[in-house]
Amino acid sequence: MLTIALSKGRILDDTLPLLAEAGIVPTENPDKSRKLIIPTTQADVRLLIVRATDVPTYVEHGAADLGVAGKDVLMEYTGQGLYEPLDLQIAKCKLMTAGAIGAVEPKGRLRVATKFVNVAKRYYAEQGRQVDIIKLYGSMELAPLIGLADKIIDVVDTGNTLRANGLEPQELIATISSRLVVNKASMKMQHARIQALIDTLRKAVESRHRS
């Protein structure tokens, strides 16, 4: 049995056509089904529907053989048991700092609100900047508006939400897209099967990119 971990939303919607190129099609619509384990048209392949931030954990610990996760999630993840063989070039966005429009950055210790705590620590450590990191799980845009933080670090797509709340994107930390991740043990035990899937997905990505 080959188990693939996916999260609902944009990543799932963009991944399903790529899996279809490999003949893997869910037997139920994952967006409408309440099932978290969904069979596919290949009897020995199933999909696990999990939270986006949990995909690397399921894959590293062998609960799933493969998964699709955003590079932002993988940058924040601290585990070691994953291969990252393929950039699927889907769900593209940017991981950026943002602050109030026209605000002057303080010269002293900077307060940064984000759910990407590990990313923030590395980013500012590389700059040699002293920061206090405040972990939030949502509504990041509020933090600079009410004085909780000087800046935020968050995923930015169009930037419309930032601008609607009086913020502006500032420094680019990383360009984000979704990646295929593979459990290291699964890659050894089911190498031929998984490598064939990787090759098929790579061709599908290249074909889509050319068009």
From Swiss-Prot:
A GO term, aspect molecular function: ATP binding
Single GO BP term: L-histidine biosynthetic process
Assigned keywords, A-Z: Amino-acid biosynthesis, ATP-binding, Cytoplasm, Glycosyltransferase, Histidine biosynthesis, Nucleotide-binding, Transferase
CC per GO annotation: cytoplasm
Pathway: Amino-acid biosynthesis; L-histidine biosynthesis; L-histidine from 5-phospho-alpha-D-ribose 1-diphosphate: step 1/9
Database matches in InterPro entries: ATP_PRibTrfase_cat, ATP_PRibTrfase_CS, ATP_PRibTrfase_HisG, ATP_PRibTrfase_HisG_short
PROSITE patterns on file: ATP_P_PHORIBOSYLTR
HAMAP family: HisG_Short
Subunit structure: Heteromultimer composed of HisG and HisZ subunits.
Domain notes: Lacks the C-terminal regulatory region which is replaced by HisZ.
Protein name: ATP phosphoribosyltransferase
Gene source species: Pseudomonas savastanoi pv. phaseolicola (strain 1448A / Race 6) (Pseudomonas syringae pv. phaseolicola (strain 1448A / Race 6))
Lineage: Bacteria, Pseudomonadati, Pseudomonadota, Gammaproteobacteria, Pseudomonadales
Gene, per the UniProt record: hisG
